[in-house]
Amino acid sequence: MELNGKTALVTGGSQGLGEQLCRDLAAAGMHVIVNCVRSAARAETIAKETGGRALVFDISDSGAVQSAFEQIETLDVLINNARVDPYKRPAEMEDAAWFDRVFGVNLKGPYLCSFAAAEKMKGRGGKIVNISSVWAYRAANRRMLEYAMSKAALHTLTRSLAKQLAPGITVNAVAPGMIESKEIQERLTPQEQEALRKSIPLARAGTAREISNAVRFLLENDYVTGEILNINGGTQFV
């Protein structure tokens, strides 16, 4: 797909990897719709700086998704990037409620948005890219359990939609490993960060730009679908 002049929706586009994706796609000539649910002011800023627009809605709410997509005239690309951070579980939240929140955003959101996007892409073609994680392949500890489960299920959604929506729409995923981010700096001591980097065969964390480049490859290549592109420095061979 030639990106220039096309329209992309990036969920969770107001920070981190989502912001990087918005800025890089805009630089490639795309009109970018910046989605978020809580950081409306930040989304508006990014949209203004990239010549796009902000669209605030909860991707886990079917009614909100339907209403939001009614406001989108044409759509060529959907990046399902929004996620629930496994380190931000409220202490008082019960297991069942946390499960629902994680799966609501990490799986139900991409499910709802992908089908809504597919309707917009009928007859014109399009690209869907899901942002997964290396945790999809791992036996998770208690903190990461729901997150890992949701990302593994996202792989099933990716491959299933790739078959269902072909030939006009390709559906792929990118599964990052450790990525340099503000969250990593906040959660881990310098010693812990260094230990993690040393455990990676390439001896460093990845960058948001490297993940964004992988997404762009999947958007520009018209003969790849149903694939999980692993960007993890050799941490996990699949």
Could you describe each region identified by the protein language model?
Residues 84, 95-112, 129, 154, ...:
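Catalytic Tyr-X3-Lys loop
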Residues 40, 56-67, 96:
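The beta1-alpha1 cofactor-binding region of Rossmann-like NAD(H)/NADP(H)-dependent oxidoreductases
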Residues 204-231, 236:
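C-terminal substrate-recognition "lid" of short-chain dehydrogenase/reductases
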Residues 155, 165-179, 224-231:
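Conserved Rossmann-fold SDR core element
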Residues 14-15:
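Conserved glycine-rich cofactor-binding loop
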Residues 127-153, 158-166, 178-179:
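Catalytic loop of short-chain dehydrogenase/reductase
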Residues 89-91, 95-103, 184-185, 192, ...:
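Substrate-binding pocket helix/loop in short-chain dehydrogenase/reductase
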